[in-house]
């Protein structure tokens, strides 16, 4: 089952592609964009830590945008490489840690935040390991990385606009869906490897 975000990504590729082509023509490397995404994620983390949640959200969006563009720039500029893939995957994990662990500064339980980080990383690990074994994992599970970033964005938005309590309820839902995705991916890989 292909996730909703995977389908949306395929549709918005038409929007990202012209921007990626422009950046490629300007000789902006995909690896630079990947690094920029990490820098924005670090700034996001520190802005949340400093209780500048609105500014934090802005940098979260910038970071996520870099993540959406870097691979397309590499493809358009024909600079896809093992190094780029390694950087992208590794820095994505660091960004995931920053995105979610910043919730501690909103007053969320550090234990629950640590579990959420662990679950998120486990989802990514299962995909990476499965794909290293030749299994396709895109679209497996109800909350892929893109959806998790959207959840982080909405949780922060609700924290500002509504209340901490409402954002906390959404965080609990985020944790539940993340745990379900771990189970879904584990089961999918287990089933495929047993055949």
Swiss-Prot record:
**Residues spanning the signal sequence:** none
GO MF terms here are: magnesium ion binding; phosphotransferase activity, for other substituted phosphate groups
Q: Which residues bind Mg(2+) 1?
A: 67, 70, 88
| Annotated cofactor note | Binds 2 Mg(2+) or Mn(2+) ions per subunit.
Q: What cellular component GO annotations does this protein have?
A: plasma membrane
Q: Give the membrane topology, semicolon-separated if more than one.
A: Multi-pass membrane protein
Q: Which reaction does it catalyse?
A: CDP-2,3-bis-O-(phytanyl)-sn-glycerol + 1D-myo-inositol 3-phosphate = saturated 1-archaetidyl-1D-myo-inositol 3-phosphate + CMP + H(+)
Q: Name one GO biological process term.
A: phospholipid biosynthetic process
Q: What is its EC number?
A: 2.7.8.39
Q: Which domain of life is it from?
A: Archaea
Binding-site positions, Mg(2+) 2 = 67, 88, 92
Q: Which cofactor is essential here?
A: Mn(2+); Mg(2+)
The pathway this protein participates in, as annotated, is: Lipid metabolism; phospholipid metabolism
InterPro entries with a match to the protein in the record: AIP_synthase, archin_ph_syn, CDP-OH_P_trans, CDP-OH_PTrfase_TM_dom, CDP_ALCOHOL_P_TRANSF_CS
Residue ranges annotated as transmembrane are 28-48, 54-74, 97-117, 149-169, 170-190
Q: Which UniProt keywords apply?
A: Cell membrane, Lipid biosynthesis, Lipid metabolism, Magnesium, Manganese, Membrane, Metal-binding, Phospholipid metabolism, Transferase, Transmembrane, Transmembrane helix
Cell compartments where the protein resides: Cell membrane
State the active site: 92
Chief location bin: membrane
Q: Which Pfam families match?
A: CDP-OH_P_transf (PF01066)
Q: What does this protein do?
A: Catalyzes the formation of archaetidylinositol phosphate (AIP) from CDP-archaeol (CDP-ArOH or CDP-2,3-bis-(O-phytanyl)-sn-glycerol) and 1L-myo-inositol 1-phosphate (IP or 1D-myo-inositol 3-phosphate). AIP is a precursor of archaetidyl-myo-inositol (AI), an ether-type inositol phospholipid ubiquitously distributed in archaea membranes and essential for glycolipid biosynthesis in archaea.
Task: Name the family the entry cites.
Answer: Belongs to the CDP-alcohol phosphatidyltransferase class-I family.
Alphabetical list of NCBIfam families matching this protein? archin_ph_syn
Q: Which HAMAP family match?
A: AIP_synthase
Q: What is this protein called?
A: Archaetidylinositol phosphate synthase
Per the UniProt entry, what species is this protein from, by scientific name? Answer: Saccharolobus solfataricus (strain ATCC 35092 / DSM 1617 / JCM 11322 / P2)
């Amino acid at each position: 089952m292909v996730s909703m975000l995977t389908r949306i990504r395929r549709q918005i590729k038409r929007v990202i592609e012209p921007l990626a082509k422009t950046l490629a023509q300007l000789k902006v490397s995909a690896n630079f964009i990947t690094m920029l995404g990490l820098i924005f994620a670090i700034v996001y983390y520190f802005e949340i830590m400093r209780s500048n949640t609105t500014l934090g959200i802005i940098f979260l969006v910038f970071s996520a945008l870099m993540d959406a563009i870097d691979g397309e720039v590499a493809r358009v500029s024909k600079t896809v490489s093992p190094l780029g893939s390694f950087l992208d995957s590794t820095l994505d994990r660091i960004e995931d840690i920053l995105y979610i662990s910043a919730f501690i500064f909103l007053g969320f339980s550090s234990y629950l935040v640590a579990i959420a980080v662990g679950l998120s990383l486990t989802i990514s690990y299962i995909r990476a390991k499965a794909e290293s074994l030749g299994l396709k994992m895109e679209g497996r599970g109800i909350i892929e990385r893109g959806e998790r970033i959207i959840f982080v964005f909405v949780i922060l938005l609700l924290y500002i606009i509504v209340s901490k309590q409402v954002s906390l309820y959404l965080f609990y839902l985020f944790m539940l869906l993340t745990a379900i995705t771990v189970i879904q991916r584990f089961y999918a890989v287990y089933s495929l490897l047993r055949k």
